[in-house]
């Protein structure tokens, strides 16, 4: 509970802008499919989202790869960033979490509706890069 409180009280943002893009996407997954727990949906969507956006923030994803996922510093930042995402996805699989929407019995027939619901009345979903409907669908495609 303490970790949950810290993650939602702004403390971890250190005064920076906080985005919960993946949470917003996942809320539509578990909102449409009540059999999907929030954590399971996040385990599927975070790696897919990261694969979509990491090139815009290569240094940050590489730092995560080096410091958290123990990726070799002999790799370029871009290679390390991607490898870190792959290792995180493998870790989720190792601990028994789903890593694909298909593992949650969700297919592409739901992607457009989930994207529309994630956007609400907006044209884009704010985040480290703003995402439009087609980009959100692409993330769901990566996660399928």
What are these regions (language model features)?
Residues 61, 68, 72-144:
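C-terminal charged capping/lid subdomain of soluble metabolic enzymes
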Residues 1-86:
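Active-site segments that bind and position negatively charged phosphate/pyrophosphate groups
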